[in-house]
Amino acid sequence: RHIITTAVEHHAVLHPMQKLEATGFEVTYLQPDHDGNITVEELKKALRPDTILVSVMMVNNETGAVMPIADMVKAVRRASPLALFHTDAVQGFLKVPFRAKALGADMISVSAHKIHAAKGTGALYIRPGLPLPAFLNGGGQESNYRSGTENMPGICGFGAACADTDAKADIARMAQLRDLAREKLAQIDGLVLIGSQAAPHIVNLSLPCLRSQGIINCLQSDGIYAVSYTHLTLP
């Protein structure tokens, strides 16, 4: 009963993994390289015949690293054919182009609020034909996977936000802004740009020896909004 994930997952993945460890599962946490990437080779080293699940995020919310999910899925299929593959695509949905069928993952999770729809709504792609037990029993909603009255306003809003998005144009615009920001930031003495930041919508930086809150206050006075930490990494 072996599971593989990464040390840089969202707590929505890390905390359940810790719970599983407490019940007897063995969990391997892959470590990122200096740019925040998890490589296929590192995953291959961790795969075992008794591996039953691999969960790797598509895009890291802090470094902007984009993981090679499709290649990882292929590696899992070869080395551990009985294992399921899940990817947290919350930061990748409509930010990094992908098609579920080409990606090959068994499960893909996304969230509405990342594309300006209402909080509290999301979606789980389940590969057709994949037999999964019910998460909640009851009225049989959501194809018997998750019983309970659906949040129809949230679902409709999520659908409308998807329909109203021009992903190709948005990605190009965000990538242009990211590159411009990195170009200008690189000219500041002492500033360190962190990670590969391959995602079009994320820029991570550090200004050693300066208090982050003071920097944020200055930026906000000019209408620029930033964060000095993320609640996703707090204990």
What feature does the model see in each segment?
Residues P16-L20, A46, P68-A79, R99, ...:
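Alpha-helical structural signal in soluble globular domains
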Residues L94, K101-A160:
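Active-site PLP attachment segment
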Residues D166-C218:
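Conserved PLP-dependent catalytic core of the aminotransferase class-I/II
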Residues P32-F93:
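Active-site phosphate-binding strand-loop segment of PLP-dependent enzymes
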